[in-house]
Design a protein with these regions (language model features):
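N-terminal low-complexity, charged segments
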Residues: 24-35, 55-62
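Acyl-donor binding region in acyl/amide transferases
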Residues: 50-94
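Soluble, non-transmembrane catalytic domains of enzymes that act on hydrophobic metabolites at membranes
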Residues: 14-17, 43-46, 51-52
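Amphipathic alpha-helical "stalk" segments
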Residues: 2, 40, 90-93
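Conserved beta-hairpin
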Residues: 34-46
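Short amphipathic alpha-helix that is part of the acyltransferase structural core
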Residues: 1-29, 84
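Charged, low-complexity, helix-prone segments enriched in Lys/Glu/Asp/Gln
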Residues: 26-31, 39, 73-79
Length: 94
């Protein structure tokens, strides 16, 4: 039995056709804007738009956990972006 690793990464423009195909499998439209994808090996299992939260997943694969992981990773990325934008919080002493 082989074990494959789920990998999360930012979508690239070269992923457009695969995102459209995944959305078609999920009877939906492809996520737009900043998109994270979850892939196992060379197969795209799920994708999530960081802009509006729209997700698609391969219904023929056990992809529910992949969608949850994309959401958690996306929230972490957004928190880090907000921290960088606002600088480090300062400690205040009473």
């Amino acid at each position: 039995m082989t074990h494959s690793t789920l990998r999360i990464r930012q979508a690239r423009h070269t992923d457009a056709a695969a995102l459209e195909q995944l959305a078609s499998l999920d009877s939906s439209h492809a996520p737009a804007g900043d998109v994270l994808i979850a892939e196992v090996g060379d197969e795209l299992w799920a994708a999530l738009s960081l802009d509006d939260g729209h997700a698609v997943a391969d219904p023929l694969r056990p992809s529910a956990d992949a969608v949850l992981m994309l959401g958690a990773h996306g929230r972490q990325l957004r928190r880090e972006e907000r921290r960088r934008a606002h600088g480090r919080p300062r400690l205040r002493f009473a």
